[in-house]
Amino acid sequence: RQFQLIKEIVPQAKRVGTLYNAAEINSVTTNNLAKEACEELGLELLEATVSSSADVFLAAQSLAGRVDAIYVSTDNTTVSALDAVVQVTNENDIPLIIADPTTVEKGALAALGFNYYQHGRQTTPIVIKILKGKKPTEIPVEFAKNLELHINMDIVREIGISPSSFRDSVSSFAKKIEEEGGQVETIVVGE
């Protein structure tokens, strides 16, 4: 859904950059899902891999000038050096969309992801089933049911987007998610 959001708020986007540590299996899995989502939406995904947080600045710079937006997943290595990505995106006027709502205030345009506390609450019944003896293989996989969309209005204004038109595009995005049976809570930062 993050890439649907990118299409909604950066409609001219053709190429999206992403940074991740290929040694983190969760990041590789997420990146594979990102590739599929981009294909479905007609976006080209340009990847920059990193081995440590020290690599993040140069990796982000390698994407500048080649992408219309940058997406950062919950990759531990990249998120630990998010300030470097923010510096590059700010210097190059590239919208930054992230998957971790707790970090949007660092300088991303928007974040779409789950609330870790609520996700823990959703997981509790599963843990109880396991503690009562049910095999994990007998329990269906669940994804976060509710998402939070955090918008950084300071960045909206900095990149010259009309706050009201931005709100309209975000509202239509949230409505689409809700029509699909999901829920999106929109949280505005910087007003």
What are these regions (language model features)?
Residues 1-191:
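Short hydrophobic alpha-helices and adjacent helix-cap/hinge residues
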